[in-house]
Amino acid sequence: MGTIIALGGGGDLLDYVRGSGEFREVHKVVYIGFASCNPEFGYNDMKNDLFGRFGIDVLHLTPQNALNSRELSERLLWDADLIYVDGGNTIQLMKTIRESGLDRVFAEIYEKSDIILSGASAGAICWCRYGNSDSLSFKGNEGKRARVSGLGIIDVLFC
């Protein structure tokens, strides 16, 4: 069974990975920014600052690649030491994960590997049964919350 590191937002993910008690060497990270309105910024931050400074390879799985090249996407994920799902619009994130078939892949990775699954905010919600999300604010409904169905790998409501 795998390891999940779910962050509410902020913090240094590498510190959490090292302190998880399940730490092993991380050489390859896959960044998933499906929820973000600016995934290139998040990817570059992970690549250049958070992990790149330690010589860790960071690869970017885009929504286009996930939706159009499932076999390539699966290979990329299975070859990772850590998968990081960034925050943003949780509804958009879950829609893309399900449409691309990655929901099944993530569940299998969790059950059959020691790959660390991680995420912040929307990226943390995705691993849980449900999440309390502000995704409606992306459509002009400021302050409104929505209960979003995650992958259910962890049977909790993430707020």
Model-derived regions: residue spans:
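Glycine/Thr-rich phosphate-binding loops of Rossmann-like dinucleotide-binding domains
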Residues: 14, 39, 93-94, 128
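N-terminal beta1-alpha1 cap of cysteine-dependent amidohydrolase-like domains
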Residues: 1-82, 86
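Conserved PLP-enzyme active-site core in the AAT-like
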Residues: 84-85, 89-97, 126
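Class I SAM-dependent methyltransferase SAM-binding "motif I" and its flanking Rossmann-like core
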Residues: 95-96, 102-159
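Short, surface-exposed, polar/charged, turn-prone segments marking secondary-structure boundaries
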Residues: 32-35, 56-60, 88-89, 111-114, ...
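Gly/Ser/Thr-rich beta-alpha loop segments that engage phosphate groups in nucleotides
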Residues: 10, 35, 89-90, 121-125
